[in-house]
């Protein structure tokens, strides 16, 4: 049996301008939704001595971009939680895995992305948004079918592998961060977005 946690909510914009409702919606959906669903199914899996949890996280759980701090916080939380839970569940024959996509060609931005606003950040946020909505960048994202193939692989390969980096863009960004290190990577991100 497999439980696939795939709900997602994105909050972008300056943290200073985020409303309490925006923060609560982000936290209730991304980490708490996954934790609650998983907790509800653990007893059944434990009794059967088998089962697998798969959670869609994000490359945003390993790298960050400006004006996405709350979204990143929730995705980093899920990655850390999943890694810890793998130890906790393994003695009961239960697996846990994450699928870590980059950009996906869906209507997520129009359907699930919320923006916080604050006048002090308006100009910088606009510059960042122009980069994010650039058609060339969007065209490099994965299709939902490509990500579904990775989910299927995670569900059926029988491996104890924790993470499945999904999509060419996610793999490239993740590899780059590992290769150059945190500070050089962060400096590169800053240059891309702010010159």
Residue ranges of model-derived segments:
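Substrate-binding pocket helix/loop in short-chain dehydrogenase/reductase
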Residues: 14-15, 22-24
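Conserved NAD(P)H cofactor-binding loop of Rossmann-fold oxidoreductase domains
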Residues: 6-11
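Residue(s) in the substrate-gating loop at a strand-loop-helix junction
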Residues: 58
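Active-site loop immediately N-terminal to the catalytic Tyr-X3-Lys motif
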Residues: 16, 63-69
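SDR active-site lid
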Residues: 91-161
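Active-site helix of classical SDR
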Residues: 38, 74
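Active-site-adjacent segment of SDR/Rossmann-fold oxidoreductases
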Residues: 63, 84-95
């Amino acid at each position: 049996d497999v439980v696939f946690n795939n709900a997602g909510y994105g909050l972008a914009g300056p943290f200073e301008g985020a409303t309490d409702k925006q923060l609560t919606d982000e936290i209730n959906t991304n980490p708490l939704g996954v934790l609650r669903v998983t907790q509800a199914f653990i007893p059944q899996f434990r009794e059967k001595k088998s089962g697998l949890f798969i959670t869609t996280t994000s490359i945003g759980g390993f790298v960050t971009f400006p004006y996405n701090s709350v979204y990143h916080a929730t995705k980093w939380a899920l990655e850390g939680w999943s890694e810890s839970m793998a130890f906790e569940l393994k003695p009961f024959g239960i697996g846990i895995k994450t699928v870590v996509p980059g950009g996906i060609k869906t209507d997520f931005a129009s359907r699930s992305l919320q923006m916080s606003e604050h006048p002090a950040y308006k100009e910088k946020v606009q510059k960042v948004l122009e980069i994010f909505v650039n058609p060339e960048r969007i065209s490099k994202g994965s299709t939902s079918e490509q990500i579904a193939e990775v989910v299927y692989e995670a569900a059926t390969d029988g491996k104890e592998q924790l993470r499945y980096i999904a999509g060419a863009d996610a793999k490239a960004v993740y590899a780059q961060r590992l290769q150059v290190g945190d500070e050089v990577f962060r400096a590169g991100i800053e240059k891309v977005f702010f010159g």
